[in-house]
Swiss-Prot record:
Pfam families: His_biosynth. Heterodimer of HisH and HisF. SUPFAM superfamilies: Ribulose-phoshate binding barrel. This is Imidazole glycerol phosphate synthase subunit HisF. It comes from Renibacterium salmoninarum (strain ATCC 33209 / DSM 20767 / JCM 11484 / NBRC 15589 / NCIMB 2235). One of its GO terms (molecular function) is imidazoleglycerol-phosphate synthase activity. Pathway: Amino-acid biosynthesis; L-histidine biosynthesis; L-histidine from 5-phospho-alpha-D-ribose 1-diphosphate: step 5/9. GO terms for biological process: L-histidine biosynthetic process. CDD domains: HisF (cd04731). Belongs to the HisA/HisF family.
Length: 256
C-alpha cells in the first residue's frame, strides 16, 4: 500500500456545537466547530468531516454559514454531511467551501440521487456515509444492516450490498461507521471493514469505536484507506493525531 493513510477527525455538529455521544445518544458538548477545525488542521489532520447529526432527523438543513467560516480558517479538505438530499444541497455546500459532500439517508431512500449528484459534480465530491449495525437473526446476507437517521432506524437493507450498489452508481468513497462500536472506544468493527472492503474498490474510511492510537492500525490492516474518529481527538491528549499517525506508521503503513 503506497498511498498515505488519511487520519480524519469527525466533528458531529448539533445546533452549532460539536457533540459526541455513545451509540449516537447521550450527546456531550465538545466545543465550537470552527475552533476545533482550526486546531485539528494545525495538529496535522489530513481532512475534516462535519456531520450535522440532527439535520436529517430534525429535517434541518446543514449549517452553510458554519461551513463557510471553517473553509476560511482551514486548508485541508472538508467533507460535510447531514441533510444532503439533492443536487442543490451539494451545490450550496461546495459554494460555501466544502470539498466533498456526504450523503446517507436520502441515498437509501432514493439511490438515483447518487447518479444525479455524481453526473453534475463528478464522483470525487460524493461520500456515501454508511451507518451499519450487526444483525444476528440472518435478516441480511452479510449480517450487517444499513441504518438511517443517525442509526435510529433499521432498513432491512444489507450493508455490503448497499456499499456495492452505491459504488456502482458512482460514489467516490465510502465512510463506513459501525453503530454498535460508535463512541464505545472498544476498537473498530474489523469484520465489517473486511466485508465491505471485499465488495468495493473505492476508498474506504473506517469509523466507529476508536479509543486509543493502537486501535487504528488493525482497521488499516482490515482494508481501510482512511480512519475517522471523534472522541480520541476531542477528549484525548492534544497530540492525539500525531500519536495515531505514529501508531499507523509503526505498523508499517505510510502516513502523511
Amino acid at each position: 500500500m503506497s498511498v498515505a493513510i488519511r487520519v480524519i477527525p469527525c466533528l458531529d455538529v448539533d445546533a452549532g456545537r460539536v457533540v459526541k455521544g455513545v451509540n449516537f445518544a447521550d450527546l456531550r458538548d465538545a466545543g465550537d466547530p470552527v475552533e476545533l477545525a482550526r486546531r485539528y488542521d494545525g495538529a496535522g489532520a489530513d481532512e475534516l468531516t462535519f456531520l450535522d447529526v440532527t439535520a436529517t432527523s430534525g429535517n434541518r438543513e446543514t449549517t452553510f454559514e458554519m461551513v463557510a467560516r471553517a473553509a476560511e480558517e482551514v486548508f485541508i479538505p472538508l467533507t460535510v454531511g447531514g441533510g444532503v438530499r439533492e443536487v442543490a444541497d451539494v451545490d450550496r455546500l461546495l459554494r460555501a467551501g466544502a470539498d466533498k459532500a456526504s450523503i446517507n439517508s436520502a441515498a437509501v431512500a432514493r439511490p438515483e440521487v447518487i447518479d444525479e449528484i455524481t453526473r453534475h459534480f463528478g464522483s470525487q465530491v460524493l461520500v456515501l456515509s454508511l451507518d451499519a449495525r450487526r444483525v444476528a437473526d440472518g435478516s441480511t446476507p452479510s449480517g450487517f444492516e444499513v441504518t438511517t437517521h443517525g442509526g435510529r432506524r433499521g432498513t432491512g437493507i444489507d450493508a455490503v450490498l448497499w456499499a456495492r450498489e452505491a459504488a456502482d452508481r458512482g460514489v467516490g468513497e465510502i465512510l463506513l461507521n459501525s453503530i454498535d462500536a460508535d463512541g464505545t472506544k472498544a476498537g473498530f468493527d474489523l469484520e465489517m471493514i473486511r466485508a465491505v472492503r471485499a465488495a468495493v474498490r473505492v476508498p474506504l474510511i473506517a469509523s466507529g469505536g476508536a479509543g486509543k492510537p493502537e486501535d487504528f492500525p488493525p482497521a488499516v490492516q482490515a482494508g481501510a484507506d482512511a480512519v475517522l474518529a471523534a472522541s480520541i481527538f476531542h477528549f484525548g491528549p492534544v497530540d492525539a493525531i500525531a500519536q495515531v499517525k505514529a501508531a499507523i506508521r509503526a505498523a508499517g503503513f505510510p502516513v502523511r
